[in-house]
Every structure is written in C-alpha cells, then in structure tokens.
Regions:
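Short glycine/proline- and aromatic-enriched beta-strand/turn motifs that initiate or cap beta-hairpins
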Residues: 26-85, 164-172
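Transmembrane beta-strands of outer-membrane beta-barrel proteins
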Residues: 29-33, 65-73, 99, 110-116, ...
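Transmembrane beta-strands of outer-membrane beta-barrel pores
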Residues: 35-41, 56, 73-81, 107-111, ...
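Residues that define the transmembrane beta-barrel architecture of outer-membrane proteins
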Residues: 44-54, 93-99, 130-134, 141-143, ...
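Flexible, solvent-exposed loop segments that connect beta-strands
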Residues: 77-94, 124-126
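Short, positively charged, low-complexity/disordered linker segments
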Residues: 115-139
C-alpha cells in the first residue's frame, strides 16, 4: 500500500513537470535533438534518441555562486538489443519509449549542466522495469552542440533494475 501511494505521488509530480514544461512559450524554448548509444550490464548496447525542449533560464544565487535553472521536457527512445544466445531469456529485445520532465542547473562550471528529470516509460524491459524512472544527466552545451552522459533507473523500487547509461551528442536550435 505504501508503494502505491508513493507511485501516485511520483505520477502526479511527473504530470505537473510535463505540464509546466509543455506550457513554455515556443519562443522561449531551445530545442535539441540528441542521439547516441546506451549500455546496460554485461556490455549490452542499444541505440538511443531524444527530442528535448529547454525553457528560458532563471538565474538565482546560492551563496557566492550565480547559477540558473531551466525547465525541460523530453521524448525519448531506447532501441532493442539484438537477440543472442546469452540474452534470449531476458526482456531486452524491444524498444522503450519515454516522456520526461524536470530541470537543468547550469552556471556552476563554464558551460556544464546537470539535469534531473522524472520519466514515464511506456514499455518495460529488464533495464527500465517500471512506469516511472529517474533521469540524471551531466553534460556540456555550446551554442549549437551538446554532449551528455545520462543515466536512467528506477532506483531499485522495482526489480529487475539494470538501468540504462548512455553517451549522447546533439544539436541545439
């Protein structure tokens, strides 16, 4: 029962984040297309792609540091892994679609950023085995390009929890 109430709160928080990010004026948003490779345990690789909208940055001060945060919303796809003799009994051979919303923090070091999102996973696999997932991203963004290291997991609230770790490169416009 306790699990169900936590799950309901996480769903409400995710929905609120997606609504806020979706309400961004189009002229205030930066759009990004990202692609790369995702790895799970055992060196099993898959393709990954994301489409992101990042809102206008909001500056704030934390001690002596001048930082900014920006809302973000993303749609993502993690491709299937090929069927092999080693993974024939694992649930890894179909794609997973994600919708996520959260925030990006920047200004702490040059053009680096840290993002944290809550995600809804439409499909399940042994890597993303619950409808809700946590997404953490560490990256660098230029005027037109970005590179990011991202991890997606449900924090072991549901097993199996292999998670996905990926390196993404993208363009901004």
């Amino acid at each position: 029962m306790r699990f169900q109430s936590w799950r309901s709160r996480a769903s409400l928080l995710l929905a609120a984040g997606l609504l806020v990010a979706g309400a961004l004026p189009a002229q205030a948003a930066t759009f990004e297309i990202l692609g790369g490779r995702s790895k799970t345990s055992g060196w099993r690789w898959a393709d990954a792609a994301f489409l992101a909208a990042v809102g206008k940055a909001h500056p704030f001060t934390l001690g002596d540091h001048h930082l900014s945060w920006a809302p973000d919303a993303e749609l993502g796809w993690i491709g299937p892994r090929p069927v092999t003799a080693q993974n024939v009994h694992e649930n890894l051979t179909h794609p997973v679609w994600l919708a996520m919303g959260g925030a990006r923090l920047s200004g702490f070091w040059r053009r680096a950023f840290f993002g944290f999102d809550l995600a809804y996973a439409k499909d399940r696999s042994d890597t993303l085995s619950s409808p809700y997932e946590f997404v953490s991203t560490l990256g660098w963004q230029g005027e037109r390009y970005l590179i990011a290291l991202r991890h997606i997991s449900n924090a072991s609230f549901h097993e199996p929890n292999l998670g996905e770790t990926m390196l993404l490169v993208g363009v901004r416009f």
